[in-house]
């Protein structure tokens, strides 16, 4: 028995986060409330005074009553607006109360739709609190600052008033002549002072899980109503209401100070915004995964964030914590209910230890990130936790041990149930259209450090056999606290990536099969490449092509040239390296290229020429294609337009029919 303040309990839970509450609810759901204080849960206080005291923050009786009554919290749609999120609702309620009392108070409001929490101000004297949404909150307490092409960005009102958010953190805004300062304070301790000067007078400070950073942009003369929104967790989008342009400005870390708080290094990272030049600012987040060396000490078990720290992305920490507690609590229940022998929880350590991130990994990846940053290559890391059934855990444990043994000489980033993907931006070669967005899926014993090194080189690089992917959980952090399979949070396998990197042309594609729809998107400078099932799905792609005026790659099942392509905007500049390739076979082996060999033969490429080429090629191979289709192939009738690099013309073979067995292995081919 555990003694605490003269009261006895069977299980004492320290920490009332997702893991702690999940553990308490699971224990209580099996009738462990027969005696008082069987399960107790404590959490640290949230006061700003810095107290280290703990309180019994959540009554287990309340949890038990909710479980017994079948009560549940409100259903939340992961795709809903932020108005449906608890943090916003609470903020609005506090704002209403303050307004009703007549207090002249500004509320620090944090956007919680993504991990990037953007500080917005709500003026409770504006009598708008009852109908506030994220944008009106921004407008009520902020003034807009002019930026490029009419896109507007909110600038904080600078005053000396102390603001306090409902989560117990405080901010101080100070006036200082025509410049400003914004100081973040947590638990009464100032952490960082960020300058808003005249030269870079527009600044937004965000807080990403205790990692403050700022975005900067030069002043311009345009003025158009806009709004601040967030997408992708770390991207701040600045978009106008009536414009098709979605501008994005991302943070770039300083290579000399990788682990410090985020900031934009003007000397190397801040550039003029020129949409025509297609310059990209990619985002990245240096972070260090950590894990406890031991998961158990006597009758004390570590679970959740107490035993492993993950990046604040994709819900991986939450899902892993829930899995920890579920693994542990059902074994504790066996002891509490008298149906199990003593100490069944010893298997908890063996079954959950493979989640740990090794220290060697941190050092290797930090070194690689520093190297990439020095080469103007920034990396954005996202992680998702793959679903592994309990029957597979023991089977994969041997592989994990082998990985651990190899880690000293070949550092590993992922363990057997982790998948990592990188989005990298390539800059610094002086070519306006240099851009690459490779995604690398890591499985089992793949080495991240090797992959990054190859990406940083200027040699040809193609993905190796990373293994077959399985379904994995949603990347949304506000998904339900559950390890169960949910159809709206998952999509099936057939994930394979084959990026090719070159110092002048970066051609990267991502292939994903979702149900019966396969969409392939790629970028070469401003070129948009789309591969789809039928002509109907081509239309939205053509809209993008019309606005980009870039290259085209279309595949379809139809026997006729799609009429929509007649309206497409075809590339008319720098086409000396472009040619048309058609495939009318079912096996993907019937690629036919134009007999023209001289560079520049397709400088007059347009819809008419491409259509004539397609029809000519199709007529010559129709009999073969139909025969192959009758055998279940169904892949004939395809046209590809692609660039050539150093005389090697690239296109990609993507079987379109569900019957094609090679759908899980799309590859680049050279012709």
Swiss-Prot record:
Which cofactors does the annotated protein need, by name? FAD
What UniProt keywords apply to this chain's record, in alphabetical order?
Aromatic hydrocarbons catabolism, Cytoplasm, FAD, Flavoprotein, Monooxygenase, NADP, Oxidoreductase
Q: Which GO terms describe its cellular component?
A: cytoplasm
> Which amino acid positions bind FAD, per UniProt?
10-43, 295-305
Q: What is the designated name of this protein?
A: Phenol 2-monooxygenase
Gene3D superfamilies from the xrefs? D-Amino Acid Oxidase, subunit A, domain 2, FAD/NAD(P)-binding domain
Q: Name one GO biological process term.
A: phenol-containing compound catabolic process
Name the protein family: Belongs to the PheA/TfdB FAD monooxygenase family.
Organism classification, top ranks? Bacteria, Pseudomonadati, Pseudomonadota, Betaproteobacteria, Burkholderiales
Q: In which pathway does it act?
A: Aromatic compound metabolism; phenol degradation
Family matches, as Pfam families: FAD_binding_3 (PF01494)
Question: What catalytic activity does the UniProt entry give for this protein?
Answer: phenol + NADPH + O2 + H(+) = catechol + NADP(+) + H2O
- The EC code for this enzyme is 1.14.13.7
Record's superkingdom? Bacteria
**What SUPFAM superfamilies does its record include?**
FAD/NAD(P)-binding domain
Free-text function comment from the UniProt entry:
Hydroxylates phenol to catechol. Also acts on cresols.
Record has Heme as a keyword = no
Query: What are the subcellular locations of this protein?
Result: Cytoplasm
Q: Name one GO molecular function term.
A: phenol 2-monooxygenase activity
The answer to whether UniProt assigns keyword S-adenosyl-L-methionine to this entry is no
